């Protein structure tokens, strides 16, 4: 018989740096999950992606066991990493903070492809371009 799902928890945690302190502890504590076990498993699974923010979808079962799936980093994080930016533009229409080439957009789209609901690489690239423009990054056509 399948386990009964108690909750689905979504978090964004820096890769390899999950600790029982907030926000992880406060999100998982009410569900009775073994927080130390989760942090060890998450840190081991994301060790190779240090410095990136990794979204996690965690399924908590009624017997307090859990499973989790890591997703690809958010597009803005990948764009900022690619351009070496600390933050996006506060006024994207007025202040531009960088420029992405078509190759850089393609590279980011290929990384994000498993998590995007895009039918092909072209539509994934279009989504990445839109995200970049909303951050104040110009995109080479």
Swiss-Prot record:
<dbReference type="InterPro" id="IPR020784">
    <property type="entry name" value="Ribosomal_uL11_N"/>
</dbReference>
<keyword id="KW-0699">rRNA-binding</keyword>
<comment type="subunit">
    <text>Part of the ribosomal stalk of the 50S ribosomal subunit. Interacts with L10 and the large rRNA to form the base of the stalk. L10 forms an elongated spine to which L12 dimers bind in a sequential fashion forming a multimeric L10(L12)X complex.</text>
</comment>
<dbReference type="InterPro" id="IPR000911">
    <property type="entry name" value="Ribosomal_uL11"/>
</dbReference>
<protein>
    <recommendedName>
        <fullName>Large ribosomal subunit protein uL11</fullName>
    </recommendedName>
</protein>
<dbReference type="GO" id="GO:0022625">
    <property type="term" value="C:cytosolic large ribosomal subunit"/>
</dbReference>
<comment type="similarity">
    <text>Belongs to the universal ribosomal protein uL11 family.</text>
</comment>
<dbReference type="Pfam" id="PF00298">
    <property type="entry name" value="Ribosomal_L11"/>
</dbReference>
<dbReference type="InterPro" id="IPR036796">
    <property type="entry name" value="Ribosomal_uL11_N_sf"/>
</dbReference>
<keyword id="KW-0488">Methylation</keyword>
<dbReference type="InterPro" id="IPR006519">
    <property type="entry name" value="Ribosomal_uL11_bac-typ"/>
</dbReference>
<comment type="function">
    <text>Forms part of the ribosomal stalk which helps the ribosome interact with GTP-bound translation factors.</text>
</comment>
<dbReference type="InterPro" id="IPR036769">
    <property type="entry name" value="Ribosomal_uL11_C_sf"/>
</dbReference>
<dbReference type="GO" id="GO:0003735">
    <property type="term" value="F:structural constituent of ribosome"/>
</dbReference>
<keyword id="KW-0689">Ribosomal protein</keyword>
<keyword id="KW-0687">Ribonucleoprotein</keyword>
<dbReference type="GO" id="GO:0070180">
    <property type="term" value="F:large ribosomal subunit rRNA binding"/>
</dbReference>
<keyword id="KW-0694">RNA-binding</keyword>
<dbReference type="InterPro" id="IPR020783">
    <property type="entry name" value="Ribosomal_uL11_C"/>
</dbReference>
<dbReference type="GO" id="GO:0006412">
    <property type="term" value="P:translation"/>
</dbReference>
<dbReference type="Pfam" id="PF03946">
    <property type="entry name" value="Ribosomal_L11_N"/>
</dbReference>
């Amino acid at each position: 018989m399948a386990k009964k799902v108690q909750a689905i928890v979504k978090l964004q945690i820096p890769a390899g740096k999950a600790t029982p302190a907030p926000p992880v502890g406060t999100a998982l504590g009410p569900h009775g999950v073994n927080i130390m076990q989760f942090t060890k498993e998450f840190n081991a699974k994301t060790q190779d992606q240090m410095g990136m923010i990794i979204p996690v979808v965690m399924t908590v079962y009624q017997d307090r066991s859990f499973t989790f799936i890591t997703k690809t980093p958010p597009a803005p994080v990948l764009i900022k990493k690619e351009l070496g930016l600390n933050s996006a533009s506060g006024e994207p229409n007025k202040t531009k903070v960088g420029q992405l080439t078509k190759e850089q957009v393609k590279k980011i789209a290929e990384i994000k492809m498993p998590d995007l609901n895009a039918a092909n690489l072209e539509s994934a690239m279009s989504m990445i371009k839109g995200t970049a423009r909303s951050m104040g990054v110009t995109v080479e056509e």
